[in-house]
Amino acid sequence: MSVNPGDFYVVSGAPSSGKSVLLRIVLGLEPADAGSVYLGGKDVTSKGPQERHVGYVPQSFALFPNKSVRENILYPMRLDKVGKVEMQETLDRVCDLLAIEDLLDKRPDQLSGGQKQRTAIARGLAKQTDFFVLDDPLVGLDFKLRERLIDDLKATRSALGVTFLYSTSDSLESLLLASRVGVLADGGISEEGDLDEVYDTPQAASSMQALGFPSANLVDGDVRSVGSSKMCSTVLGDVEVSGDVAPGPVLVGIRSEHVQVGTAREGAV
């Protein structure tokens, strides 16, 4: 997996596919079984979380219940011994970006679910770094709130000019947020690249299913040569094949948004 500066890189995969474990390895919270972790071109595989200087927004709200919103957001900056002026400037910036200025004196038990998540995101973004890891931060929220927070996250990343590594099992989130995407399947990244590239020309069935709203339908097919062209036979009928596809069994992905309704022809299903 390779994340470039300025990316909104989304790790997309089914629930329990290992997304959180992968992110925790990047953060230094879990050891890697093999391979190395590089941040900013430096090998940090043996470094602990504090030495990696990565901002983190976990899946759960994980707020201190006895501290105000203000103190929750200031906490990572106090750990990093940030100066008072810079702390206040950062607090003002993240609160303005996430529209939570009026919540600063409230405790978590006085907040709605959306306000708690905004506070958790603000605390993660208060870390003095240009690289942030967000582990499925919108899971469990209703659609309208998720839609609003998706807009907030895109605007925040753009305004700060930072890099986001984000995980989700929700294909719509992947499509709305990612500039680059890595599809996690069978214990590894099965495919990665620019979102448009992976969506338009997927090289793995896992990509077809992870990126789509709804997910693509997969059917078995068989490619055969017919004169100078190639045809693929499926239970849905025959279709001409373009590109460099070898004759033989294949898996055909059908996206519902690419299906057109027309007049039935002979042999159609």
Regions found by a protein language model. Give the residues of each.
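Conserved ABC transporter NBD signature motif
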Residues: G35-D43
